[in-house]
Regions:
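Internal nucleotide-binding/catalytic subdomain
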Residues: 1-69, 73-75
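Short, well-ordered secondary-structure micro-motifs
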Residues: 5, 32-35, 81-82, 131-133, ...
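Active-site "cap" helix and flanking loop/linker of ATP-utilizing ligase/carboxylase catalytic domains
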Residues: 48-69, 85-133
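A short beta-strand motif that forms the metal-chelation/ATP-contact edge
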Residues: 77-87
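Peripheral (often C-terminal) accessory segments that flank ATP-dependent C-N-forming ligase machineries
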Residues: 108-165
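Residue-level signal for inorganic ion chemistry
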Residues: 7, 106, 166
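Contiguous C-terminal substrate-recognition/catalytic subdomains in enzyme active sites
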Residues: 74-76, 96-97
Length: 166
């Protein structure tokens, strides 16, 4: 495969579906390291088909809330990888990077409220997971412009453990 990407949607109680832009996901030792926009041409060429597949799943399940499906971009089109019936780590960029975050839209959907705008609010966005002892370098993260630190407040630092994201 050429790349992995996420399709994140929110479906309301009335069946309305909205999608956030799809991110290119990079992994390190099997753990999501980054989710980035723009995702690149290989992914952009496959997003419409992947969204249609995601829409079919959400509608068939009569799902309400945020649903994430991950795909591999291949020469033959998108290949399904996994599904998360919830807000997802690859969508944490929406907190500051979208008009309405995946968290807010999830609550809106399950509460029967109108869904919010999912538009990306910047030309490029990257969410980077902070893994293990990297959380001890918060000054490095906070010193960068347009960076927002999310420390999960976990008491124990362990190798391979997601401690936060920026």
């Amino acid at each position: 495969f050429e790349a992995e990407f996420s399709v994140i949607l929110v479906r309301g109680q009335d069946g309305e579906i909205r999608f956030w832009d799809s991110t290119r996901n990079s992994h390190d030792h099997g753990i999501l390291a980054t989710s980035s926009l723009p995702a690149g041409e290989a992914i952009a060429a496959q997003v419409d088909r992947a969204r249609e597949l995601a829409r079919q799943v959400a509608d068939a399940l009569r799902y309400v809330g945020v649903l994430t499906l991950e795909f591999f971009a291949t020469r033959d089109g998108p290949v399904f990888n996994e599904m998360a019936p919830r807000v997802h780590n690859s969508g944490h960029w929406t907190i500051e990077g979208a008009a309405t975050s995946q968290f807010e839209n999830h609550i809106r959907a399950v509460a029967g409220l109108p869904l919010g705008d999912t538009a990306t609010v910047a030309g490029s966005v990257t969410m980077t997971n902070i893994i293990g002892a990297d959380i001890l370098q918060t000054e490095q993260w906070l010193g960068q412009p347009d960076t927002h630190l999310h420390d999960y407040g976990k008491a124990e630092v362990r190798d391979g453990r997601k401690m936060g994201h920026v």
